[in-house]
């Protein structure tokens, strides 16, 4: 079952749920197997991977998060007093020298909710990196195990109610990825997971996601994105595995295309998933 925006009754409506339940039951009686497909498409043709927006409307705490950068352009000798953005969690605060790529960790200059810093000579910018809700996305936070499990439980129960789980033989997940603005999906837990995985603090590395910070730029970005790929694996895909195994259902999924290890034209995260 792979509903689209053209499906009638409209996906997520009570009429759709009733029709889907009836279809599943008839397939079971006929000896046919049913696969539920959660698909996400950027042009909203496939609403099931987002539960049609119904899930995050009911559970806003599980909405996808994005990484936002707030940049303040400084002048040499300026006494900076800039408020910390309060719309999300502060992940990193740094200074970036535009001409040389040098970065400075400014955490010691955060006083309360304000960055207080005297700008040295050079062409410096102050950068805040904030993990905040992506109000433009109605996807679940796929980097979170709890959010992913809640999403799967929500969509499954809406279709089957308290019915026999044997009615469904397989779930298929397509397009589950970084469904936020410019694919900047992030997690408030990122720094903690990174430090546990690699043994050091990632906060000074954040500017490398947006700028050239010198010869280590590629290494830093690889470490950061590898951690995000791990969180996706330990988030949605582990939740999917646990959810379906507990119900005796087969789960399957696919990366954007199966040859990502041979021709990674799209994203390096695919190689981590294959690993």
Q: Model regions: which residues?
A:
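Short hydrophobic alpha-helical runs that function as membrane-insertion/retention elements
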Residues: 1-2, 34-36, 253
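Conserved beta-strand edge residues that scaffold enzyme active sites
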Residues: 5-6, 41, 258-259
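Carboxylate/His-rich catalytic cores and anion/metal-binding grooves
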Residues: 168-202, 240, 245-275
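N-terminal-proximal low-complexity accessory segments that begin disordered
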Residues: 1-9, 15
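Surface-exposed amphipathic alpha-helices with a cationic face
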Residues: 24, 28, 238-245
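Mature extracytoplasmic enzyme cores
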Residues: 12-222, 227-234
